[in-house]
Each structure stands twice: as C-alpha cells, then as structure tokens.
Amino acid sequence: MSADCSVGSNPLAQLNKHAQQNPALRQVGYQNPASNVAQNFKTHVNEVSNANRFQMDQFMNRSPGFSDGQLGMAPVPSAILSHGPRFGLKKQDSGSSNMSAGDTAQHSRSWGNEFNSRSPQQGLASRVNNVERISNTNSMSSYRPGMSRIGRPMMHTGISSLHNYSHMSQQTPQMSSDDGVLADKQWNEQFEALEKAVAENLTMEDNKEETKEEIVVEDGYQADFQEVWDKLQAETADNNLETSDSQWEKDYARYMTGKATHIPPYRFDNDNQYMHNPNAYEIGCILMENGAKLSEAALAFEAAVQEDPAHVDAWLKLGLVQTQNEKEMNGISALEQCLSLDPTNQQALMTISISYINEGYDLTAFSMLNRWLDSKYPELTRSPTIDEANIDRFNLSKQVITKYLQVANALPQVDPEVQLGLGTLFYANEEFGKTIDCFRTALEVNPNDELMWNRLGASLANSNRSEEAIQAYHKALALKPSFVRARYNLAISSMNIGCYKEAAESLLSALSMHEVENVPITGSVVQSNNILETLKRSFVAMDRRDLLEKVMPGMDLQQFRNEFNF
C-alpha cells in the first residue's frame, strides 16, 4: 500500500456511506443524498438550521450524546503519532505501539478533557492553527507530536488520495450569511481539520492491520520453536526408552546413594597418529606445556598408556587432560586407572573428587577428599577413622569438612590445595558463598592457576552472578586458551544472560579444539555430547532451526564460520 492510499474509495463517499449506515447520524440536518457529495456539501451547508447547529456543537464539543462506539472511533495513542513515518513502525517498537487498554483509556480521558475544557470557539481556533501548521508540509508520510491533539478522528471514514481532497478544498465556497452559521473561512478550515483527522484514523487502522500481520508472523515463529523443542524432547524420550534396566539401576544407585557403582572402561580413539611412538608420553607433556589442543595431547597420552598400561604418570596426565577437555567420564576412567596403580596419588585424588562432584557421585567424592587429606597431612588427621561404608551423605560431608577446617587452622600458612578441597566440599553442599571465599583465598597464593579461575567462575555462576563468572572464565582462558571446559562454562553463563550468539561461538570454538589435524572426526569420541547438546539449546534460543539441524556428532564446523567467529 502506498503512502497516499488507504481504503481505495472517495473520502466523502465514505462519509456518506457511514451516515447512511449509522442511525445516530440520520437525524434532522444530516440527511444526505448519494449523488455528488462534494457539491451537496458546498451548496447546502449554508442552510444550517438551529437543529443542525445543535448537532454540530455536539460534534465539536464532544457531547456525551455521541460515544466513541457510536461514531466508530478508535483512540489513537500520542506515542504512536510521534514515532515517525507510518511505515516506519518496526517489530521491536511494539512496546510503544501496542498500548494496554488502561493506557488507551487514560489517553482518551485526557483528550476528552482537553476538548471539553475549551469553549467551542477556542477549540476551533486551536484546531485551525494545527491544520495550518500541517498544511505547510509537503508530505503526509510522517506524523508530528503536535498532531496528537486532534489525533482522534471525529468519524470513522476513509480517504483515497490527497489529490482529490486538495482539488475540492481549493474550490471557492459560495456561502450566504445566516444567524449562528460558521463563517465561510472557518467552515472550510474546520472541514479540512476533520478530513485530516479522518486520514489519521485510517492510518492508525492500517497500523493495526500491520500489527495483526506481525502477530501472525510471531505465531509462526512460536510454532516453529515449539516444533523444534518437541523434537528435542522426543529424542530425549527415545534415548531414555533405549536405556537398559541395568543402566537404570546404576542411575538409581548414583542419585540415591551418591556412590559410583560402575566406571566404564576408557574409550580410546581409533585413529591415533602417535601409536607405536616410543616418545608419545614426552610429546604429550610438551603439547600440554606449549598450550596445544588438549585433544592432541590426549592422543599422545593414549598412545603411551596403550604401549605401557602400567604407566602411572601417563594415566594421570590423560585424566587431567580429558577432564579439562570436557570429557568427564573418560577422565574419571583414566584417573581410576592411575589410582589403581598408585592409591595415594594426591593429584589424581583431588582431580577425580572434583569430577565425581560434577557427575553427582557425592559420597565417592567425599571419600576421595578424605583420602587426599589423610595422604597429604597424616600427622594432622589422627582423628578416628571415618566408617565410609556405613554413613549417610550428610554426616560424611560434615565429618570431612571438620577435618579440613582443623587442618587449615593448624597450618602456618595457606595451602591452596586444602582451600580447593574445602571449597569443593562446600560446593557439593551448595554453600557457594563459602566456596567462593575458599577459591579466592587459593588464588591469592597462586593467581596464575587457570583451573582455580575456572572453578571460581563455576561457583559464581551457581550463585547467580553470571557477569562475574564470565570475567573469571576469561581470566582462565587468558592463562590457557586451549582450556575447553572454561569455554564450555563461559557459554553457559553467556546463555544465562541472554547472549546466545556469543554462547554459540564459545561452544563452536570448544568443538574446534576437539579436532586434530590429519585425524578424521570419529563422532562422540572426539566431540563432547555436553557441548553438542548445549549448542543445540543455543540455536533454539536464537530461533535458528536451520542451524539446529546441522548439529550432530562428526559435523563439519566450517559450515558455521561464515556467521560465527570462532
């Protein structure tokens, strides 16, 4: 629809049609034949009787005799009239264009009071001044705030083009003087004001139609979103149905007892360029120290442990790498292998306890933390041995925390590892404030510990402090750019504050670090399921079904580089 077209019919013909259809207008002085409406107005308007004048006064002073419903008027909020071109209203402006009923009623009362507060002559003079200002402009495509005073049309009618109306208004009216009749100039100006008001009313109706179309489009988006969400839910349901009874029993044991009843064996990558390399372990250590991709270092350590299954340090390094690489269960499997060879390995005990907390095996984690403290400070932990086999979660947590506090108070200086263990215990009990205090104390001793910065970020995120968490994750990534888990956690916090595109970029960056040059992608072994599922959620939040359908194990990340920076 063009800027100067509305309903496609002559304005005065519409006025005539409305008068014929509305019984409230078919009274003395408002009978109007269907032929030559413009000429009728020009030649017979001078014959205004007292009854006609009373009806006109009712129009101009907004007498209660004519309600908005009778005249078919729609209130026009002034906020809309001051928002620029009529076709310039955008979806994101819906907050100003879609006013509530209460707001509309308030505007209606204020306009009514403004009209009623003036005498008929004062109201006419004000309207004439407004019309004169408007007539000086060359375009009707934009609205001005000043128009809000007469923004409510006096009748529900139509206007087809400015050309027809301007042609009629340029004719010299032939009126004879009569008692109580408006002067020639005043009548033309008033009629012009009414015609302008009619045009405004039609413009607002067009805007309403556009709003309806936008609502239909938004409903379509909502339907697409619901369809995608239902599909994801269905996939989850299918996966749950495929779960065996034994797996259900394992999950039950996990959530009801907090103990790890069965740890799956380590899943090795089938394509490993470091296999049969006698220096695989050393290569892995060099890759870690130089900030190479964790997935590449993992391949080197995998080759080392397959070459020598009793290599304790290789199992330890492999477990450390995989937990940082957002492959928790593989990391736990490697660390368990390390502990089976060296039950008092302190780094393995601390790392695996944190992994068990992440996976929900709290009792097993508390047991590991207790073992770590006994192995590190045996002289300070001579309290009675905890019966871990016959104790509930609450009491085990309480006793282990008490031991850690005793050791922390007995030490002459802060031990960051004791603070880490104590903070992990508080974290498991969702006492995140205490956790944050412990981790910050540890960072005061070692501010360049990227792992501790990541753990601090996780604690802040769980305390609903996403912005601070993001800062902590960025600090961890500044110290170690290949830290995949920190990128994953950063994506979670970004989603929590509505930054879905930034979250997707962090996740895609994390997935890209799972790729190793000259090694084909082999699906779930290489790419973390957690990252893939979170990436799907970010695309759903972005309402990007086209991208969602591309997310799958082994996908080519190059297809996302044109739109995302990673």
Swiss-Prot record:
Pfam families: TPR_16 (PF13432). This is Peroxisomal targeting signal receptor. A motif (WxxxF/Y motif 2) lies at residues 187-191. It comes from Kluyveromyces lactis (strain ATCC 8585 / CBS 2359 / DSM 70799 / NBRC 1267 / NRRL Y-1140 / WM37) (Yeast). One of its GO terms (biological process) is protein import into peroxisome matrix, docking. The gene is PEX5. Residues 94-142 have a biased composition (Polar residues). A motif (WxxxF/Y motif 3) lies at residues 248-252. One of its GO terms (cellular component) is cytosol.
